[in-house]
């Protein structure tokens, strides 16, 4: 669990995004410069990505070169999505929000 105020801000962003979009999950990412990005799952026909991959795509579109942390709330991301993040930046902190609003390391 993290008590880092910056990670708790990501929790707030992810929860607000999930609530605002009425989505089953949302993710918030902080890059190594402190910029933040949010995303929800995307589905269009046969194409589907969870919120973890969606937030990575949004961040990569802004040319990030490192990830500090990602917080996912709602539906747990697929193991393959977690692997993508770990291979993108092995030092990235990755958390899932528990029902008690605690950050659990993935």
Feature-to-residue mapping (PLM):
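C-terminal binding/interaction regions
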Residues: 2-23, 57, 62-106
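Residue-level detector of alpha-helical recognition elements and their boundaries
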Residues: 29, 48-49, 70
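Hydrophobic "anchor" residues
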Residues: 35-36, 103
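Short beta-strand scaffold segments in enzyme catalytic cores
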Residues: 25-35
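A short, polar/charged loop-to-alpha-helix boundary motif
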Residues: 45-60
